From Swiss-Prot:
NCBIfam families found in the cross-reference section: met_pdase_II
Cofactor names: Co(2+); Zn(2+); Mn(2+); Fe(2+)
Enzyme class: hydrolase
Predominant location: cytoplasm
Protein name: Methionine aminopeptidase 2-1
Any GO CC annotation of this UniProt entry: cytoplasm
Species per Swiss-Prot/TrEMBL record: Colletotrichum graminicola (strain M1.001 / M2 / FGSC 10212)
PROSITE patterns assigned to the protein according to its UniProt record, in alphabetical order: MAP_2 (PS01202)
Binding-site positions, a divalent metal cation 2: 246, 315, 348, 444
Length: 463
Protein backbone atom coordinates (compact mmCIF):
# COMPACT_ATOMS: atom_id res chain seq x y z
CA UNK A 1 0.00 0.00 0.00
CA UNK A 2 1.75 3.14 -1.23
CA UNK A 3 2.42 6.11 0.99
CA UNK A 4 1.17 9.27 -0.71
CA UNK A 5 3.61 12.18 -0.84
CA UNK A 6 2.05 15.27 0.80
CA UNK A 7 1.06 18.01 -1.66
CA UNK A 8 3.85 20.47 -2.49
CA UNK A 9 6.39 18.47 -0.48
CA UNK A 10 9.72 18.02 -2.22
CA UNK A 11 10.87 14.40 -1.87
CA UNK A 12 13.63 14.39 0.70
CA UNK A 13 11.75 15.08 3.87
CA UNK A 14 12.24 12.13 6.21
CA UNK A 15 13.98 14.44 8.61
CA UNK A 16 17.43 13.96 7.10
CA UNK A 17 19.79 16.80 6.09
CA UNK A 18 20.05 17.85 2.44
CA UNK A 19 22.68 16.18 0.29
CA UNK A 20 25.94 17.96 -0.28
CA UNK A 21 27.05 15.77 -3.17
CA UNK A 22 25.63 13.81 -6.11
CA UNK A 23 23.33 10.91 -5.43
CA UNK A 24 24.61 7.47 -6.27
CA UNK A 25 22.82 6.47 -8.99
CA UNK A 26 11.33 -12.89 -3.29
CA UNK A 27 9.33 -22.10 1.09
CA UNK A 28 9.77 -25.00 -0.66
CA UNK A 29 6.60 -26.66 -1.90
CA UNK A 30 5.02 -28.33 1.00
CA UNK A 31 3.86 -31.88 1.34
CA UNK A 32 4.06 -34.47 4.03
CA UNK A 33 6.61 -37.24 4.05
CA UNK A 34 4.63 -40.37 3.49
CA UNK A 35 5.73 -43.60 5.18
CA UNK A 36 4.87 -47.14 4.25
CA UNK A 37 5.12 -50.39 6.21
CA UNK A 38 7.24 -52.89 4.31
CA UNK A 39 6.06 -56.44 3.74
CA UNK A 40 7.20 -58.89 6.40
CA UNK A 41 9.75 -61.17 4.78
CA UNK A 42 10.43 -64.44 6.50
CA UNK A 43 13.29 -65.47 4.24
CA UNK A 44 14.39 -69.01 3.31
CA UNK A 45 15.54 -71.48 5.90
CA UNK A 46 18.90 -73.02 5.16
CA UNK A 47 19.13 -76.66 4.13
CA UNK A 48 20.21 -79.25 6.68
CA UNK A 49 22.07 -82.49 5.88
CA UNK A 50 19.97 -84.42 8.41
CA UNK A 51 17.08 -85.87 6.44
CA UNK A 52 15.16 -86.67 9.62
CA UNK A 53 14.83 -82.96 10.31
CA UNK A 54 12.83 -82.53 7.07
CA UNK A 55 10.39 -85.36 7.82
CA UNK A 56 7.28 -83.61 9.12
CA UNK A 57 5.74 -86.86 10.31
CA UNK A 58 8.67 -87.42 12.64
CA UNK A 59 8.10 -84.08 14.45
CA UNK A 60 6.25 -84.05 17.74
CA UNK A 61 2.68 -82.64 17.69
CA UNK A 62 3.67 -79.74 19.96
CA UNK A 63 6.47 -78.75 17.58
CA UNK A 64 3.96 -78.76 14.70
CA UNK A 65 1.68 -76.35 16.59
CA UNK A 66 4.60 -74.07 17.39
CA UNK A 67 5.59 -74.08 13.72
CA UNK A 68 2.12 -72.83 12.76
CA UNK A 69 2.32 -70.08 15.35
CA UNK A 70 5.61 -68.93 13.92
CA UNK A 71 4.13 -68.49 10.46
CA UNK A 72 3.12 -64.87 9.93
CA UNK A 73 0.63 -63.57 7.50
CA UNK A 74 1.99 -61.00 5.08
CA UNK A 75 1.24 -57.50 6.27
CA UNK A 76 -1.21 -55.56 4.19
CA UNK A 77 0.26 -52.51 2.61
CA UNK A 78 -1.03 -49.39 4.26
CA UNK A 79 -2.39 -46.78 1.95
CA UNK A 80 -0.24 -43.66 2.11
CA UNK A 81 -1.85 -40.78 3.95
CA UNK A 82 -3.12 -38.15 1.59
CA UNK A 83 -0.75 -35.22 1.40
CA UNK A 84 -2.41 -32.05 2.63
CA UNK A 85 -2.51 -29.40 -0.04
CA UNK A 86 -4.10 -26.01 -0.37
CA UNK A 87 -7.51 -25.97 -1.99
CA UNK A 88 -8.67 -23.68 -4.78
CA UNK A 89 -10.03 -21.24 -3.76
CA UNK A 90 -7.76 -21.34 -0.69
CA UNK A 91 -9.71 -22.46 2.37
CA UNK A 92 -7.42 -24.90 4.24
CA UNK A 93 -6.10 -23.17 7.39
CA UNK A 94 -2.33 -22.76 7.47
CA UNK A 95 -2.25 -24.50 10.85
CA UNK A 96 -3.39 -27.72 9.09
CA UNK A 97 -0.66 -27.44 6.46
CA UNK A 98 2.07 -26.57 8.98
CA UNK A 99 1.17 -28.66 12.07
CA UNK A 100 4.43 -27.75 13.81
CA UNK A 101 3.58 -24.06 13.55
CA UNK A 102 6.86 -23.16 11.84
CA UNK A 103 6.60 -21.22 8.58
CA UNK A 104 9.12 -20.86 5.74
CA UNK A 105 11.54 -17.95 5.82
CA UNK A 106 11.71 -15.44 3.00
CA UNK A 107 14.70 -14.83 0.76
CA UNK A 108 17.77 -13.94 2.80
CA UNK A 109 20.21 -11.44 1.27
CA UNK A 110 23.55 -10.58 2.85
CA UNK A 111 24.23 -6.86 2.94
CA UNK A 112 26.47 -5.55 0.15
CA UNK A 113 28.63 -3.71 2.64
CA UNK A 114 29.29 -3.76 6.36
CA UNK A 115 27.43 -0.86 8.00
CA UNK A 116 29.84 1.85 9.16
CA UNK A 117 28.34 3.95 11.94
CA UNK A 118 29.13 7.64 12.00
CA UNK A 119 31.96 8.56 14.34
CA UNK A 120 30.84 10.10 17.62
CA UNK A 121 32.07 10.29 21.18
CA UNK A 122 28.81 9.50 22.96
CA UNK A 123 28.74 6.30 25.01
CA UNK A 124 25.35 5.39 23.48
CA UNK A 125 24.21 6.98 20.25
CA UNK A 126 20.60 7.88 19.53
CA UNK A 127 20.66 5.31 16.72
CA UNK A 128 21.69 2.63 19.22
CA UNK A 129 18.91 3.67 21.55
CA UNK A 130 16.41 3.42 18.70
CA UNK A 131 17.77 -0.01 17.81
CA UNK A 132 17.38 -1.23 21.40
CA UNK A 133 13.67 -0.50 21.07
CA UNK A 134 13.55 -2.62 17.87
CA UNK A 135 15.50 -5.65 19.13
CA UNK A 136 12.30 -7.65 18.94
CA UNK A 137 12.97 -8.17 15.21
CA UNK A 138 15.25 -11.07 16.17
CA UNK A 139 12.55 -12.61 18.37
CA UNK A 140 11.65 -16.08 16.97
CA UNK A 141 7.96 -15.59 17.74
CA UNK A 142 7.84 -12.29 15.83
CA UNK A 143 9.70 -13.77 12.87
CA UNK A 144 7.31 -16.71 12.80
CA UNK A 145 4.32 -14.33 12.84
CA UNK A 146 5.80 -12.44 9.89
CA UNK A 147 6.57 -15.64 7.98
CA UNK A 148 3.07 -16.96 8.63
CA UNK A 149 1.54 -13.76 7.23
CA UNK A 150 3.85 -14.00 4.21
CA UNK A 151 2.91 -17.63 3.54
CA UNK A 152 -0.78 -16.69 3.62
CA UNK A 153 -0.06 -13.91 1.11
CA UNK A 154 1.82 -16.31 -1.19
CA UNK A 155 -0.86 -19.00 -1.17
CA UNK A 156 -3.71 -16.56 -1.76
CA UNK A 157 -1.95 -14.73 -4.58
CA UNK A 158 -1.11 -18.06 -6.22
CA UNK A 159 -4.85 -18.66 -6.46
CA UNK A 160 -5.42 -15.14 -7.84
CA UNK A 161 -2.80 -15.63 -10.55
CA UNK A 162 -4.21 -19.03 -11.52
CA UNK A 163 -7.95 -18.41 -11.24
CA UNK A 164 -8.73 -14.78 -12.07
CA UNK A 165 -9.58 -14.18 -15.71
CA UNK A 166 -11.30 -11.47 -17.76
CA UNK A 167 -15.00 -11.40 -16.90
CA UNK A 168 -14.50 -11.44 -13.13
CA UNK A 169 -15.82 -8.42 -11.24
CA UNK A 170 -13.44 -6.55 -8.96
CA UNK A 171 -15.82 -7.22 -6.07
CA UNK A 172 -15.57 -10.98 -6.66
CA UNK A 173 -11.76 -10.76 -6.78
CA UNK A 174 -11.53 -8.68 -3.59
CA UNK A 175 -13.97 -10.95 -1.76
CA UNK A 176 -12.09 -14.04 -2.92
CA UNK A 177 -8.77 -12.66 -1.68
CA UNK A 178 -10.13 -11.59 1.69
CA UNK A 179 -12.10 -14.80 2.25
CA UNK A 180 -8.94 -16.73 1.44
CA UNK A 181 -6.82 -14.74 3.90
CA UNK A 182 -9.35 -15.18 6.70
CA UNK A 183 -9.77 -18.90 6.00
CA UNK A 184 -6.02 -19.59 6.00
CA UNK A 185 -5.69 -17.69 9.27
CA UNK A 186 -8.72 -19.57 10.69
CA UNK A 187 -10.11 -16.24 11.84
CA UNK A 188 -13.26 -14.76 10.30
CA UNK A 189 -12.81 -11.44 12.11
CA UNK A 190 -16.31 -11.01 13.48
CA UNK A 191 -15.90 -10.84 17.26
CA UNK A 192 -14.26 -7.82 18.95
CA UNK A 193 -10.49 -8.23 18.92
CA UNK A 194 -10.46 -10.87 16.17
CA UNK A 195 -9.16 -8.47 13.51
CA UNK A 196 -6.41 -7.31 15.87
CA UNK A 197 -5.16 -10.87 16.34
CA UNK A 198 -4.87 -11.57 12.62
CA UNK A 199 -6.51 -10.71 9.32
CA UNK A 200 -6.24 -8.16 6.54
CA UNK A 201 -3.45 -5.61 6.89
CA UNK A 202 -5.49 -3.14 4.82
CA UNK A 203 -8.29 -3.40 2.22
CA UNK A 204 -7.50 -5.18 -1.03
CA UNK A 205 -6.44 -2.68 -3.69
CA UNK A 206 -7.53 -3.51 -7.25
CA UNK A 207 -6.60 -0.71 -9.64
CA UNK A 208 -7.12 -0.85 -13.41
CA UNK A 209 -5.05 0.97 -16.03
CA UNK A 210 -4.64 4.68 -15.10
CA UNK A 211 -6.08 4.03 -11.62
CA UNK A 212 -2.84 3.50 -9.74
CA UNK A 213 -3.40 2.97 -6.02
CA UNK A 214 -5.99 2.88 -3.24
CA UNK A 215 -9.08 1.65 -5.05
CA UNK A 216 -11.27 -1.09 -3.61
CA UNK A 217 -14.88 -1.96 -4.46
CA UNK A 218 -17.24 -0.56 -1.83
CA UNK A 219 -21.00 -0.71 -1.23
CA UNK A 220 -23.06 1.42 -3.59
CA UNK A 221 -20.50 1.44 -6.40
CA UNK A 222 -21.18 -0.04 -9.82
CA UNK A 223 -19.66 -3.42 -10.58
CA UNK A 224 -16.38 -3.13 -12.50
CA UNK A 225 -15.67 -6.09 -14.79
CA UNK A 226 -12.08 -7.06 -15.61
CA UNK A 227 -11.38 -6.89 -19.36
CA UNK A 228 -8.74 -8.63 -21.47
CA UNK A 229 -6.94 -5.35 -22.19
CA UNK A 230 -6.78 -4.20 -18.56
CA UNK A 231 -3.64 -3.82 -16.46
CA UNK A 232 -4.60 -4.65 -12.86
CA UNK A 233 -2.56 -3.83 -9.76
CA UNK A 234 -3.30 -6.26 -6.89
CA UNK A 235 -2.17 -4.87 -3.52
CA UNK A 236 -3.20 -6.42 -0.20
CA UNK A 237 -1.76 -6.92 3.25
CA UNK A 238 -1.86 -9.78 5.76
CA UNK A 239 -1.17 -9.25 9.44
CA UNK A 240 -0.53 -11.60 12.36
CA UNK A 241 -0.44 -10.00 15.82
CA UNK A 242 -0.10 -6.60 14.16
CA UNK A 243 2.94 -7.44 12.00
CA UNK A 244 1.89 -6.53 8.46
CA UNK A 245 3.15 -8.09 5.24
CA UNK A 246 2.54 -5.59 2.42
CA UNK A 247 3.09 -7.05 -1.03
CA UNK A 248 1.70 -6.27 -4.49
CA UNK A 249 1.91 -7.42 -8.09
CA UNK A 250 0.45 -6.51 -11.48
CA UNK A 251 -1.55 -8.73 -13.84
CA UNK A 252 -2.25 -8.30 -17.54
CA UNK A 253 -3.58 -10.70 -20.15
CA UNK A 254 -2.14 -8.87 -23.16
CA UNK A 255 1.63 -9.25 -23.81
CA UNK A 256 1.63 -5.64 -25.05
CA UNK A 257 2.16 -4.54 -21.45
CA UNK A 258 4.93 -6.99 -20.55
CA UNK A 259 7.62 -4.29 -20.54
CA UNK A 260 5.51 -2.06 -18.29
CA UNK A 261 5.26 -4.88 -15.76
CA UNK A 262 8.95 -5.73 -16.14
CA UNK A 263 9.91 -2.11 -15.40
CA UNK A 264 8.18 -2.05 -12.01
CA UNK A 265 9.43 -5.53 -11.11
CA UNK A 266 13.02 -4.58 -11.97
CA UNK A 267 12.78 -1.26 -10.13
CA UNK A 268 11.43 -2.94 -7.00
CA UNK A 269 14.20 -5.54 -7.03
CA UNK A 270 16.77 -2.77 -7.56
CA UNK A 271 15.38 -0.93 -4.55
CA UNK A 272 15.53 -4.09 -2.46
CA UNK A 273 19.11 -4.75 -3.51
CA UNK A 274 20.15 -1.19 -2.62
CA UNK A 275 18.35 -1.18 0.75
CA UNK A 276 20.21 -1.98 3.95
CA UNK A 277 21.43 -0.77 7.30
CA UNK A 278 22.92 2.75 7.13
CA UNK A 279 21.91 3.13 3.47
CA UNK A 280 20.58 6.60 2.68
CA UNK A 281 17.09 7.04 1.27
CA UNK A 282 18.41 9.10 -1.65
CA UNK A 283 20.63 6.21 -2.77
CA UNK A 284 17.73 3.73 -2.83
CA UNK A 285 15.57 6.21 -4.75
CA UNK A 286 18.28 6.75 -7.36
CA UNK A 287 18.56 3.01 -8.03
CA UNK A 288 14.79 2.71 -8.37
CA UNK A 289 14.49 5.53 -10.88
CA UNK A 290 17.43 4.36 -12.95
CA UNK A 291 15.96 0.86 -13.30
CA UNK A 292 12.40 2.03 -13.94
CA UNK A 293 13.21 4.58 -16.61
CA UNK A 294 15.45 2.24 -18.59
CA UNK A 295 12.26 0.68 -20.04
CA UNK A 296 9.83 1.69 -22.75
CA UNK A 297 6.61 0.09 -23.97
CA UNK A 298 4.91 0.12 -27.36
CA UNK A 299 1.12 0.39 -27.21
CA UNK A 300 -0.93 0.41 -30.40
CA UNK A 301 2.02 1.50 -32.49
CA UNK A 302 3.21 4.30 -30.19
CA UNK A 303 6.28 4.02 -27.95
CA UNK A 304 6.04 5.37 -24.40
CA UNK A 305 8.93 5.76 -21.96
CA UNK A 306 8.12 4.23 -18.59
CA UNK A 307 8.27 6.93 -15.91
CA UNK A 308 8.63 6.55 -12.17
CA UNK A 309 5.59 7.97 -10.35
CA UNK A 310 6.63 11.09 -8.46
CA UNK A 311 4.15 11.61 -5.63
CA UNK A 312 3.74 8.21 -4.02
CA UNK A 313 6.43 6.43 -2.01
CA UNK A 314 7.62 3.20 -0.50
CA UNK A 315 7.54 3.31 3.29
CA UNK A 316 8.49 1.71 6.57
CA UNK A 317 5.99 -0.36 8.56
CA UNK A 318 5.34 -0.36 12.28
CA UNK A 319 3.20 -2.69 14.33
CA UNK A 320 -0.47 -2.15 13.41
CA UNK A 321 0.58 0.84 11.26
CA UNK A 322 1.05 0.35 7.54
CA UNK A 323 2.80 3.72 7.11
CA UNK A 324 5.41 4.11 9.81
CA UNK A 325 6.79 7.57 8.99
CA UNK A 326 9.78 7.08 6.68
CA UNK A 327 9.24 7.39 2.92
CA UNK A 328 11.29 6.29 -0.10
CA UNK A 329 10.43 8.26 -3.27
CA UNK A 330 10.87 6.67 -6.70
CA UNK A 331 12.81 9.64 -8.06
CA UNK A 332 16.22 11.08 -7.23
CA UNK A 333 16.25 13.34 -4.18
CA UNK A 334 18.50 14.75 -1.48
CA UNK A 335 17.15 12.84 1.51
CA UNK A 336 20.08 11.79 3.70
CA UNK A 337 17.91 9.84 6.15
CA UNK A 338 19.37 6.39 6.82
CA UNK A 339 17.66 3.05 7.00
CA UNK A 340 18.37 1.46 10.38
CA UNK A 341 18.80 -2.01 11.80
CA UNK A 342 15.55 -3.45 13.08
CA UNK A 343 13.35 -1.49 10.69
CA UNK A 344 10.74 -3.02 8.38
CA UNK A 345 10.16 -1.56 4.91
CA UNK A 346 7.62 -2.07 2.15
CA UNK A 347 9.77 -1.58 -0.95
CA UNK A 348 7.36 -0.85 -3.79
CA UNK A 349 7.51 0.99 -7.08
CA UNK A 350 4.99 2.32 -9.59
CA UNK A 351 5.71 2.84 -13.28
CA UNK A 352 3.48 4.74 -15.69
CA UNK A 353 3.06 5.70 -19.34
CA UNK A 354 1.32 8.89 -18.21
CA UNK A 355 2.48 12.09 -16.53
CA UNK A 356 3.97 10.42 -13.49
CA UNK A 357 2.02 12.58 -11.05
CA UNK A 358 -1.11 11.17 -9.43
CA UNK A 359 -4.26 13.04 -8.49
CA UNK A 360 -7.02 12.23 -5.98
CA UNK A 361 -9.84 10.49 -7.79
CA UNK A 362 -13.50 10.37 -6.77
CA UNK A 363 -14.56 8.30 -3.78
CA UNK A 364 -12.98 6.91 -0.63
CA UNK A 365 -10.79 3.81 -0.53
CA UNK A 366 -10.71 3.35 3.23
CA UNK A 367 -10.23 4.86 6.67
CA UNK A 368 -7.68 4.59 9.45
CA UNK A 369 -7.36 5.91 12.99
CA UNK A 370 -4.87 8.76 13.15
CA UNK A 371 -2.01 7.72 15.43
CA UNK A 372 -2.02 11.16 17.06
CA UNK A 373 -5.81 11.34 17.41
CA UNK A 374 -7.03 12.55 20.82
CA UNK A 375 -7.88 9.76 23.25
CA UNK A 376 -11.11 11.49 24.20
CA UNK A 377 -13.12 13.59 21.79
CA UNK A 378 -16.61 15.03 22.02
CA UNK A 379 -18.67 13.99 19.05
CA UNK A 380 -22.06 15.54 18.25
CA UNK A 381 -23.78 12.24 17.45
CA UNK A 382 -24.25 9.23 19.70
CA UNK A 383 -24.00 7.05 16.59
CA UNK A 384 -20.54 8.49 15.87
CA UNK A 385 -19.41 7.62 19.40
CA UNK A 386 -20.67 4.05 19.02
CA UNK A 387 -18.99 3.75 15.63
CA UNK A 388 -15.69 5.05 17.05
CA UNK A 389 -15.84 2.43 19.83
CA UNK A 390 -16.50 -0.34 17.29
CA UNK A 391 -13.62 0.78 15.06
CA UNK A 392 -11.16 0.82 17.96
CA UNK A 393 -12.29 -2.62 19.15
CA UNK A 394 -12.30 -4.21 15.71
CA UNK A 395 -9.45 -2.55 13.81
CA UNK A 396 -7.37 -0.33 16.09
CA UNK A 397 -5.07 1.60 13.76
CA UNK A 398 -5.42 -0.91 10.88
CA UNK A 399 -6.89 0.65 7.73
CA UNK A 400 -10.39 -0.64 6.92
CA UNK A 401 -13.08 0.00 4.30
CA UNK A 402 -16.87 0.18 4.28
CA UNK A 403 -17.15 -3.44 3.12
CA UNK A 404 -15.61 -4.47 6.42
CA UNK A 405 -18.25 -2.54 8.37
CA UNK A 406 -20.96 -4.28 6.34
CA UNK A 407 -19.48 -7.68 7.32
CA UNK A 408 -19.91 -6.72 10.96
CA UNK A 409 -23.60 -6.00 10.38
CA UNK A 410 -23.31 -2.22 10.71
CA UNK A 411 -25.56 0.10 8.72
CA UNK A 412 -26.23 3.84 8.45
CA UNK A 413 -22.62 4.58 9.35
CA UNK A 414 -21.72 7.13 6.65
CA UNK A 415 -22.63 10.16 8.76
CA UNK A 416 -20.59 8.73 11.63
CA UNK A 417 -17.56 8.18 9.39
CA UNK A 418 -17.73 11.74 8.07
CA UNK A 419 -18.04 13.05 11.63
CA UNK A 420 -14.96 11.11 12.77
CA UNK A 421 -12.96 12.41 9.79
CA UNK A 422 -13.97 16.03 10.41
CA UNK A 423 -13.06 15.77 14.12
CA UNK A 424 -9.56 14.45 13.40
CA UNK A 425 -10.16 10.92 14.64
CA UNK A 426 -10.08 9.13 11.28
CA UNK A 427 -8.07 9.74 8.13
CA UNK A 428 -9.73 8.93 4.80
CA UNK A 429 -7.79 7.69 1.77
CA UNK A 430 -8.80 8.64 -1.77
CA UNK A 431 -8.06 6.56 -4.89
CA UNK A 432 -4.99 7.83 -6.77
CA UNK A 433 -4.85 7.98 -10.56
CA UNK A 434 -2.72 9.19 -13.47
CA UNK A 435 -4.25 10.74 -16.60
CA UNK A 436 -6.94 8.74 -18.37
CA UNK A 437 -5.60 6.62 -21.21
CA UNK A 438 -2.35 5.88 -19.40
CA UNK A 439 -1.31 2.56 -17.87
CA UNK A 440 0.48 1.95 -14.58
CA UNK A 441 2.18 -1.04 -12.94
CA UNK A 442 3.29 -1.92 -9.41
CA UNK A 443 5.37 -4.52 -7.57
CA UNK A 444 6.10 -4.59 -3.85
CA UNK A 445 7.80 -6.67 -1.14
CA UNK A 446 8.19 -6.41 2.62
CA UNK A 447 11.77 -6.63 3.89
CA UNK A 448 13.16 -7.00 7.41
CA UNK A 449 16.48 -5.27 8.11
CA UNK A 450 17.99 -7.86 10.43
CA UNK A 451 21.40 -7.75 12.07
CA UNK A 452 23.41 -9.63 9.45
CA UNK A 453 21.06 -9.75 6.45
CA UNK A 454 17.81 -8.46 5.00
CA UNK A 455 14.98 -10.95 4.75
CA UNK A 456 12.59 -10.45 1.84
CA UNK A 457 9.85 -12.09 3.82
CA UNK A 458 7.17 -11.93 1.09
CA UNK A 459 9.37 -13.31 -1.71
CA UNK A 460 7.86 -16.19 -3.68
CA UNK A 461 8.52 -18.14 -6.84
CA UNK A 462 6.26 -15.74 -8.76
CA UNK A 463 8.04 -12.45 -8.02
Amino acid sequence: MGSKTPEEQIPGGNGGPPSTGPSSSGGEPRGTHLSRDGDGSLGDHGDDDDADEDDVSSRPLRADVEEKKKKKRPKKKKKPAAAKEQSSPPRVPLSDLFPLGEYPAGEDLVYDRVPQPDANTARTTTAELRYQSRKHLEDPALLNDYRKAAEVHRQVRHWVQEAVKPGWTLLDIATGIEDGVRSLLANQGIEPGDNLRSGMGFPTGLCLNHETAHYTPNPGQRDVVLQHGDVMKVDYGVQVNGWIVDSAFTMSFDPTYDNLLAAARDATNSGIKAAGIDVRICDVSAEIQEAMESYEVEIRGKTYPVKAVRNICAHDIKRYRIHGGKSIPFIRNNDQTKMEEGEIFAIETFGTTGRGKLYDDIGVYGYGLLHDAPAQVRLPFASANRLCKTIKEQFGSIVFCRRYLDRLGLDRYLAGLNCLVSHGVLESYAPLADIKGSYTSQFEHTILLRESSKEIVSRGSDY
